[in-house]
UniProtKB/Swiss-Prot annotation:
Name of the protein in its database record: Inner membrane-spanning protein YciB
HAMAP family linked: YciB
Phylogenetic classification of the source organism: Bacteria, Pseudomonadati, Pseudomonadota, Gammaproteobacteria, Alteromonadales
InterPro entries according to UniProt: YciB (IPR006008)
Main localization (coarse): membrane
Length: 181
């Protein structure tokens, strides 16, 4: 259920874009992200920082897109969110307070060195996605960017998540690996 809620704004954005245009889709994205927060809080009685940051970015850049009738703002939102994620992960790792370890470390007991590898992998991933988004958003047609944002970035994120899980699994202690089989 939680994963469906995470994808709800993206699905609504894509569907509304296909039937209308980028401006109506941007307004729908703002509304869907707000709805996501309300439903998430109603079901789980808490909100993650990532959801709040995403909502703030969607609201700011979506509103700018609507007010100035310029799709560049909603396109930049993707890169800025990825840059913030990369920055947060990188700074936390430099301070020896891995965000990924704090999120997953209770379930996956691996060495700090492995958490550092995973963190820098995701920093690189987010940075590269942000840069590729700039290229696709401003060098290719709007339709291509929307498809890239919805399908390309989602697929890349899922693939990288699977790669990360396999990498972490490989470095789990033997007794914990047996528990997962």
């Amino acid at each position: 259920m939680k994963q469906l809620l995470d994808f709800l704004p993206l699905i609504i954005f894509f569907a509304v874009y296909k039937f209308f245009d980028i401006y109506i889709a941007s307004g729908a994205l703002i509304a869907a992200t707000a709805l996501q927060l309300v439903v998430t809080y109603a079901l789980y009685k808490k909100l993650e920082k990532m959801h709040l940051i995403t909502f703030a970015m969607v609201t700011v850049f979506g509103t700018l897109t609507l007010v100035f009738h310029d799709d560049a703002f909603i396109k930049w939102k993707v890169t800025i969110i990825y840059a913030l994620f990369a920055l947060a992960l990188g700074v936390s790792q430099l301070l020896n307070k891995s965000i990924l370890k704090s999120m997953l470390g209770k379930e996956m007991k691996v060495a700090d060195k492995i958490w550092a590898h995973v963190t820098w992998y995701w920093v690189s991933f987010f940075a590269i996605c942000g840069l590729v988004n700039i290229y696709v958003a401003f060098r290719l047609p709007l339709e291509t960017w929307v498809n890239f944002k919805v399908f390309g970035l989602t697929a890349l994120t899922l693939i990288n998540t699977v790669i990360t899980v396999f990498y972490l699994y490989k470095h789990l202690p033997e007794d914990q690996r047996k528990e997962l089989k």
